[in-house]
Amino acid sequence: MASVNKPRTVGVGLLGSGVVGEAIQDTLFHDLSGALGKEIGLDLRKIYTRNPKGKKWYRKRPALFTSRAEEVLDHPGVDIVIEALGFQSVRQLPQFRDYILRAFRNGKSVVTSDKAVLARYGKEIWSAAKRSGQQLRFEACVGGGIPVIRSLSESFAIEEPEAIFGIVNGTCNYILSQMEKSGKPYAEALKEAQEKGYAETNPASDVNGSDAEAKLILISWVGFGLQLQPGRIWRKGIEDIQAVDFRYAGRIGGSTIKQLAVAQRKGQAVQVFVSPALVARDNFLASVDGATNAICFAGKNSSAGRGERDCDYVLVGPGAGGGPTAVAVLGDVCELARSERKFSGVPSLIPPGMLKLQAENDIDVPFYVRFVVKDRAGIVGDIGRTFGRIGVNISEIWQLRHVEEEIQSLKQSAKLKQKYQDMLPFVMTLERTTLRQMRKALDSIRNRDYIVIDPVWFPIWGGK
């Protein structure tokens, strides 16, 4: 009788027992007799968390838990370390980086779901992986359950990416979707997202765009070889968007508003930004609803002659949550378990240094601008002349009849006390211009005595 070769056992250590860490434990412990245990040979050998006794699996498997991270990082039977600590403050990031570096020094490969650590310390971490000869995998950092990194590596192996863009934060997409559907003010939509578990108690990293920024840093690294740092990307949050903006968006070609992360090649530079954007209804991204994420890819050759809104294919799915993220993490772990786990290089499709980051002020897009001014003659003309002097061309001007509820919502968002008749909202769409010109024009306009609320402005994606 022929002997059956059993897979060698691969020891796994887990840092973190929060939402993602617990979902990883659920999958591994429920599958001990299944594919992960028998066919791949995964064996979870140690779990670090600060307070083990309160955790779901502690009662059944107390010996696996520890409150000392070094018991995972220095464990002789651990081959792969999963870092799923989930940061609450940037002050934690140096420590999480040190955990990853220690794992490499001890000859262990690392799988992480922590985008913030890689966005800030990616270059240092990759250098350490190379020195140690170990692997680093981070599929879960970008798309949660969507295989963004794997798709980039496989699909663009024979051609360079031209653009990678899409919706990478489910919290923001849920909030904006609710504002559009129900007409709720931003504050109410955010509260609902928190009640349903889509937004954290402190939602700042989601709504101000920093979560999307970290993901975009990794996308730009893999797709374009850019080694960026947080703070170098132009970033706008969604906090100033109000339901009235969706009414105007609907009138402007049936558009909607989505928070987009964009990396788009412009010659030898890459235009990179995170911002809410006006998206035309015929664009696929306009139909992506709720907490769903979607990422579009366009190749340099196949995109020739097409508009920047178009893409070769789209990945859609749940971008966050314990279950989808655990699937992505364990997919990386399984891939490492099947391989020799030797360092295979930085996974950039374009060698680092070939392309540069486009200067922030040179970002070149059309814009949507919502003004709220005092109701008196000559204001629209004055604003138009200011844009004209700076070389910014107005495409259209929109003024809707506003119900009092919309006016009250605008007043509350800006904490104003002006009477209803004193406020006149209207929208301008601007032809393609640079961020430098846009800022110069708005700096000139915003301090004039007729401005009631600071202008709300953001790109029109795919506009001419």
Regions found by a protein language model. Give the residues of each.
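N-terminal Rossmann-fold NAD(P) dinucleotide-binding loop
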Residues: 21
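A structured beta-alpha segment of the ubiquitous adenosine-cofactor-binding alpha/beta core
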Residues: 62-95
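Substrate-binding/catalytic subdomain of NAD(P)-dependent oxidoreductase enzymes
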Residues: 188-287, 291-294, 321
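A conserved regulatory-domain signal marking ACT and ACT-like small-molecule sensing domains
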Residues: 15, 328, 333-464
